[in-house]
A protein has these predicted regions:
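C-terminal regulatory or interaction extensions
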Residues: 1-298
Length: 298
């Protein structure tokens, strides 16, 4: 099976006792189109790579007219997504691998699950699995350099996104029966990208946590304390957001001020105006009056 999947002729696909296809679906400018690729995967994955729209765009850092120019997608990450799907597909289910290209992301779907551990354990590059679902296939793909030899593939995808100041990949839509990789190809929150651009020595761990914040996903209390201490985030859980430093850099000062809330003098002025109208206010009324004016981290 390994030989047929990687280097077998298309006309020999019938010798396999399962489907061996990658379906590419593309959603662009209101149109939907695509293609179907089969064996030999060592060649057809490169053909599919050539169909994916990839281009450079600019990110302007704070107080500079010289932009950072980055690729929408990292070529190695695209191939990693496809090759991992081939390597870890549960072929007994007789299902196809699906690559979906949207305007701002790529999605890779294959049947099966993470054979050992959770994807988050592989982000730092420290975990090495003890066994694989398709050992012969994986060994062959390692030998011809289709996949990483030290199981750094997921780590390298995350590092590449950080190095290009883009949102992190995720497997959040995965289930017990299917692995789904989402690879962003555009900016979600400009503040996040400018934060990475201004702090290129930021650890990958911090970048992943900051990515969780920009996507509105929960992070642990310890992570919140860490990011807050480093001046990367502000706000009151669950309403976390980037710090004032980045807000100024991206013309979101008004939005930041609303999240930051009024200062003491402004709150006092607000109370006095209310007293001029109502003459008397109880504590409960004052609390209600000021609650939406207080900062999220009050």
């Amino acid at each position: 099976r390994t030989t047929l999947l990687l280097v077998g002729k298309e006309t020999s696909a019938h010798k396999l006792n399962h489907i061996a296809q990658i379906v590419w679906k593309c959603f662009q400018d209101g149109q939907v189109f695509g293609d179907i690729y089969t064996i030999p995967f060592v060649l057809t994955t490169t053909e599919l790579l050539g169909r994916i729209r990839n281009y450079r765009f600019k990110i302007y850092p704070k107080d500079s007219l010289i932009p950072a120019e980055v690729w929408k997608y990292d070529t190695e990450s695209i191939l990693e997504g496809m090759h991992n799907s081939i390597a870890h597909q549960q072929y007994e289910k007789n299902a196809r691998i699906i690559v979906t290209e949207n305007m701002d992301s790529l999605k890779f779907q294959n049947d099966g699950n993470f054979y050992e551990g959770d994807y988050k354990e592989y982000i730092t590059g420290e975990k090495t699995p003890k066994s694989y679902r398709n050992p012969a296939l994986i060994k062959a793909m390692v030998n011809i350099r289709m996949i990483d030899t030290q199981d750094y593939g997921i780590h390298k995808m995350y590092q590449s996104q950080k190095d290009r100041y883009l949102p992190m990949p995720d497997y959040d839509l995965s289930t017990a029966d299917e692995v789904i990789l989402n690879l962003p190809g555009t900016i979600i929150d400009e503040n996040y990208s400018l934060m990475l651009l201004a702090n290129q020595d930021m650890s990958l761990t911090d970048a992943v946590l900051l990515d969780q914040v920009q996507k509105g996903k929960p992070i642990s209390d310890n992570a919140i304390k860490k990011l807050r201490k480093e001046g990367l985030i502000e706000g009151r859980k669950p309403h976390l957001y980037v710090s004032k430093q980045i807000a100024k850099a991206t013309n979101t000062q008004v939005e930041y001020t609303l999240k930051k809330g009024f200062n003491d003098a402004e709150c006092q002025e607000w109370i006095m105006k209310a007293l001029n109208v109502n003459m008397v206010l109880c504590r409960k009324q004052i609390n209600k009056l000021l609650w939406n004016k207080l900062p999220f981290d009050y």
